[in-house]
Amino acid sequence: MPITTPKQKTTQRIKMRIHKGDTVQVITGKDKGKTGEVLRTLPIENRVIVQGVNIRTRHVKPTQEGESGRIVTEEASVHASNVMLYSNNKKIASRVALVVEKDGSKKRRLKKTGELID
């Protein structure tokens, strides 16, 4: 039998157009249509953690004597391709375009509304 090696996970950082603190809307999956704030981005895995979306329940065993176990609910990550930036003013989700200003700075702009993010 040949010896097989497990697949190597790419460690290359992926540029993400979604940043911490952005308001996003989920476009696919069981939480489709939900909106929330991005709590954390995971650029190596190309995933984001969104507040109130993809809730998972975890059972924690007691760590010390006399302490009781507990059930913890927390947000799990969602792939970045499954969320879109959300405009709170127009109440619509949109794709993002990178715009270079005259002074050379890069800004993010919502394609549907033309609203500047940064």
Swiss-Prot record:
Keywords: Ribonucleoprotein, Ribosomal protein, RNA-binding, rRNA-binding. It comes from the Bacteria. InterPro entries: KOW, Rib_uL2_dom2, Ribosomal_uL24, Ribosomal_uL24_CS, Ribosomal_uL24_KOW, Translation_prot_SH3-like_sf. The keyword Ubl conjugation does not apply. GO terms for cellular component: ribonucleoprotein complex; ribosome. GO terms for molecular function: rRNA binding; structural constituent of ribosome. One of its GO terms (biological process) is translation. One of two assembly initiator proteins, it binds directly to the 5'-end of the 23S rRNA, where it nucleates assembly of the 50S subunit. One of the proteins that surrounds the polypeptide exit tunnel on the outside of the subunit. Part of the 50S ribosomal subunit. HAMAP family: Ribosomal_uL24_B. Belongs to the universal ribosomal protein uL24 family. This is Large ribosomal subunit protein uL24. It comes from Prochlorococcus marinus (strain MIT 9303). The gene is rplX.
